[in-house]
């Protein structure tokens, strides 16, 4: 939905196929790995007030999922900031036969709440309607993730987190733009790994990094996990 305002909507399918071809090349070079087909938020990220109705979002996500499904191992719904957007995305993703992971973005100062203000725990009702195969929290500050994971764990699914490296993203409900934020300079690879190992201690088995968490962070996290005796699939 961000290509259309730029007059690039006709490239939607081709751009997906180009990205999918490149990720298959990367996996072949690495010799291992799962390919997750990403489906992000509709409208502006971090603006749950701009979420389209469920029937609209479900159709848009189904279109995307059908493009991705033949080329990926799983569908990853990510940076979801409201219960209704989760409903639409899950319905769309389930139009394919691929496993579906649902990842939500939480408030930076209260990881028990989605950016909409709705409780993370309320995902239980959404998942009862349309199931997922795993649940995660992403694209929020690492400081918020422990609380988010505590709310996700009782859902009874594999769970995890991949935080961002942004400054606090404050609620914003004016106009149609995204809230202001910037990259942090205090989130070193060592500090990010400290957070991530705490998530593992909570039982999380799906760990990674989102925006502004780069290769150096992931490389150091890999080393720390190995050193702690964890197996990395």
Residue positions per predicted region:
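Domain-level signal for soluble alpha/beta catalytic cores
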Residues: 1-233
């Amino acid at each position: 939905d961000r290509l259309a305002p730029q007059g690039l909507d006709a490239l939607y399918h081709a751009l997906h196929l180009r990205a999918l071809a490149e990720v298959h090349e990367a996996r072949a070079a690495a010799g291992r790995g799962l390919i997750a087909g990403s489906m992000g938020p509709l409208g502006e990220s971090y603006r749950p007030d701009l979420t389209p109705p469920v029937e609209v979002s479900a159709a848009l996500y189904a279109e995307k999922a059908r493009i991705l499904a033949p080329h990926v191992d799983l569908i990853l719904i990510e940076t979801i900031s409201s219960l209704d957007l989760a409903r639409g995305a899950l319905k769309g993703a389930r139009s394919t036969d691929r496993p579906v992971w649902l990842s939500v973005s939480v408030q930076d100062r209260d990881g028990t709440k989605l950016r909409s203000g709705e409780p993370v725990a309320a995902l239980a009702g959404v998942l009862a309607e349309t199931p997922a195969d795993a649940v995660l929290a992403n694209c929020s500050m690492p400081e918020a993730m422990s609380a988010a994971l505590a709310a996700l764990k009782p859902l009874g699914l594999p769970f995890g987190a991949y935080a961002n490296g942004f400054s606090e993203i404050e609620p914003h409900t004016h106009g149609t733009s995204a809230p202001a934020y910037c990259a942090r300079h205090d989130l070193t690879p060592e500090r990010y790994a400290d957070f991530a190992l705490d998530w593992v201690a909570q039982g999380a088995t799906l760990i990674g990094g989102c925006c502004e968490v780069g290769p150096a962070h992931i490389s150091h996290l890999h080393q720390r996990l190995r050193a702690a005796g964890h197996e990395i699939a």
